[in-house]
Amino acid sequence: MFSPLTDLSRARILLSNDDGFEAEGLAVLERVARTLSDDVWIVAPETEQSGAGHALTIHDPLRFRARGEKRFSVRGTPTDCVLVAVNHLMDRPPDLVVSGINRGGNLGEDVHYSGTVAAAMEGTLLGLRAIALSQVFETNGTGIADPFQVAATHASDVIRRVCGRPWNRQVLINVNFPDCPLDAVTGIELKRQGRRKMGDDIEERRDPRDRPYLWIGAQRKEDRKTAGTDMEAISRGAITVTPLCVDMTDLPTIEALTGAF
């Protein structure tokens, strides 16, 4: 178990993301992190890596560039960034890895594709506390002037609360902030992962030379707002906190298959 980390002012915090080094969400996260600690490092992808999942670069060299004190961009995936930071760039490991703030929610099955979640997961695999933060964006827009305002306002409180409790060393914490006005936020709720699948709306198009290509859209086959899930809670304006385990073994199925081999 991770012991409670109650004094974040003494903590070393590593930030990463999947939207890229120049992303607005990372800038918001840096401001949040600096309200918690003075020892903040940023190691993020040089370019956007949304949907990269837990990909690791093993067939190409990893280029990195210093972008200021304790600030680096890496020409690689979010997973690469956390590995490079912890195993090469930093003189000692961070006390906390925070990934985000993603431009868009990471709810339900999103977590399997998300580079934001993968960066946090890599931190967990390295034996570190890790939190993934995502700000939900409605595709039809809500007219909110500052789309990151809920995350910017509540992220530090959520991080403090989570770090103030012990949790399993095989678990990362996935946090999603609702897309709503500040006064419409209903609270912070612990929820299990919901279900929603993307990638079923593959569209074939033609380029100017009349060659076919495919485009994977963001249309969800079904958003199941089942009670008790992150998706249902976010639809009510709640901030959701979902523990995710890196050990994906299903013990009941092991029991069910006992004797088959």
UniProtKB/Swiss-Prot annotation:
Which InterPro entries does UniProt cross-reference here? SurE (IPR030048), SurE-like_Pase/nucleotidase (IPR002828), SurE-like_sf (IPR036523)
- In this chain, a divalent metal cation is annotated as bound at 18-19, 50, 102
Claim: Oxidoreductase is one of the keywords in the record: no
Give compartment(s): Cytoplasm
Q: Which cofactor does it need?
A: a divalent metal cation
The annotation note on the cofactor reads:
Binds 1 divalent metal cation per subunit.
Which is a Gene Ontology cellular component entry for this protein?
cytoplasm
The GO terms this record gives for MF are: 3'-nucleotidase activity; 5'-nucleotidase activity; exopolyphosphatase activity; metal ion binding; nucleotide binding
What Gene3D superfamilies does this protein map onto?
Answer: Survival protein SurE-like phosphatase/nucleotidase (3.40.1210.10)
Q: What is its EC number?
A: 3.1.3.5
Q: Which domain of life is it from?
A: Bacteria
Keyword Nucleotide-binding recorded: yes
Q: Which Pfam families match?
A: SurE
Among SUPFAM superfamilies, the record links this protein to:
SurE-like
Keywords of the record, alphabetical order, are:
Cytoplasm, Hydrolase, Metal-binding, Nucleotide-binding
Which reactions does this protein catalyse? a ribonucleoside 5'-phosphate + H2O = a ribonucleoside + phosphate
Which family would the database say this protein is a member of? Belongs to the SurE nucleotidase family.
Q: Which PANTHER family does its entry note?
A: 5'-NUCLEOTIDASE SURE (PTHR30457), 5'_3'-NUCLEOTIDASE SURE (PTHR30457:SF12)
Relate the protein's function as given in its record: Nucleotidase that shows phosphatase activity on nucleoside 5'-monophosphates.
What is the name listed in the Swiss-Prot or TrEMBL entry for this protein? 5'-nucleotidase SurE
Which species is this UniProt entry from?
Rhodospirillum rubrum (strain ATCC 11170 / ATH 1.1.1 / DSM 467 / LMG 4362 / NCIMB 8255 / S1)
